[in-house]
């Protein structure tokens, strides 16, 4: 379990940093949660210490690549928001290329970043089984919800018009939907929210490399 938390912390940290100048709502969501749950700050600090300790103890450990099963919840109002399987697969491909440092422009890494550029030995795949039953790892839910506001949790619950998360201890949940305003997406840090809202939310025009993705964001 500790290893899973560590991997997800890396993933969400990278997502938050890469979107910092592109209207990522991660920090705003975190601040909003901490205002009503101030005890989460101490828990997050404690987790950070444990992660740093784990890193020091395992810095020379040899490990094989870890594969994280992903479930993509497509919550849509109309056909244009109901992105294709192919579009979803392109985003998974981009994640794997980036985390395994197999992206085509890896050789163009700026000199200052070369010491830190590495194969993270983390891979992602769409979930193949859920509750013992074969699955595509893709859930489609048509909704009457308007655009999803940054501080709304409706996207995370089927009874509220969204799509409920699969076991967040076993799957990385990603919700793709129409997000209100200029927010492109957000992610939840460990101890940064309800376990049922744990995952990543991305606007359908900023997901993948084909289909509905906006021209400026076709690199996944």
Model feature map: region roles:
Residues 52-96, 175-181:
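Fold-level signature of zinc-dependent metallopeptidase catalytic domains
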Residues 5-6, 32, 143:
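Sequence-pattern detector for short linear motifs
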Residues 19-65, 99:
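N-terminal zymogen propeptides
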Residues 10, 74-76, 128-130:
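Short glycine-rich, polar/acidic loop-and-turn segments at beta strand-coil junctions
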Residues 1-25, 95:
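Bacterial Sec-dependent N-terminal signal peptides
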Residues 89, 93-220:
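Metzincin-family zinc-dependent endopeptidase catalytic domain
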């Amino acid at each position: 379990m500790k290893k899973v938390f560590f991997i997800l912390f890396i993933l969400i940290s990278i997502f938050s940093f890469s979107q910092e100048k592109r209207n990522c709502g991660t920090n705003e969501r975190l601040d909003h949660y901490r205002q009503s749950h101030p005890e989460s700050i101490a828990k997050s600090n404690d987790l950070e210490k444990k992660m740093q300790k784990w890193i020091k103890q395992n810095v020379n450990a040899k490990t094989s690549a870890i594969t994280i099963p992903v479930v993509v919840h497509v919550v849509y109002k109309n056909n244009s928001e109901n992105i294709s399987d192919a579009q979803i697969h392109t985003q998974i491909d981009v994640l794997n290329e980036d985390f395994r440092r197999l992206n085509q422009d890896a050789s163009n890494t700026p000199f200052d970043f070369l010491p830190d550029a590495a194969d993270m030995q983390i891979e992602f795949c769409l979930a193949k089984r859920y509750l013992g039953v074969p699955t595509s790892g893709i859930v489609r839910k048509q909704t009457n919800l308007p655009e999803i506001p940054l501080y709304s949790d409706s996207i995370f619950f089927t009874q509220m018009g969204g799509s409920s998360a699969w076991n967040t201890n076993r799957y990385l949940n990603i919700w793709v939907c129409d997000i209100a305003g200029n927010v492109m997406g957000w992610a939840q840090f460990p101890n940064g929210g309800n376990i049922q809202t744990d995952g990543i939310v991305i606007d359908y025009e900023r997901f993948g490399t084909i289909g509905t993705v906006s021209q400026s964001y076709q690199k996944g």
